[in-house]
């Protein structure tokens, strides 16, 4: 058992924020502490303090740690019925209101399934009209996987046969996304809790991530998302992430998953 666990963890969160810029206090403490403690025990460190000393010196360990605190569960068109609503109900509205290039942000994009799903949807719905997709995540290693765009069949269960054949090249046991979809996406490292949010988006997609944030962390993220949307732009979130008072952020409810900037 790690001695003085509570005191040690509080010290750890302070120095991680000060030296690494990661604010663990904005994640739910019980879940985050349990996850980090399990990792420390696995790595055979005695205290959070000892672990932090090595974390600052070991780039590989730091990458592992960032991967640990990042939630990376994704698939193409996850919860397909909600993507159908996006394509058939929300996107036509955005296209009607938007002028010029349609700007989309896939926030906390994990290994790329979400932004590539957006690119496939845009390709068939927008046609020759220009669009730009920004895809961001906290973890550099997971972003590298997203750029490569190679996936196992289990990650593609929601895809139709036509989508598999038109958007991917089969490579043995894996599927490689076609280059034209990669070219339409800008991948970038971004921390939702601390980094600057670009402005002027027509659509922001951030699903099944904020459930791991504290109330304060969620409030900050929703406020910044609202500021990043153009008037009439839409925020698409996960089914368990309902915004209780959207008007506080200048948003109005389209349904439980879509919020429009008023």
UniProtKB/Swiss-Prot annotation:
Coiled-coil regions, chain positions: none
GO MF terms held by the record: protein methyltransferase activity; protein-glutamate O-methyltransferase activity
GO biological process: methylation
Keywords: Methyltransferase, S-adenosyl-L-methionine, Transferase
UniProt cross-references to InterPro entries, sorted A to Z: Bact_Chemotaxis_MeTrfase, CheR_C, CheR_MeTrfase, CheR_N, SAM-dependent_MTases_sf
Superkingdom in the source lineage: Bacteria
UniProt cross-references to SMART domains, sorted A to Z: MeTrc (SM00138)
Extent of the signal sequence: none
Bridged cysteine pairs (disulfide): none
Protein purpose: Methylation of the membrane-bound methyl-accepting chemotaxis proteins (MCP) to form gamma-glutamyl methyl ester residues in MCP.
Name of the protein: Chemotaxis protein methyltransferase
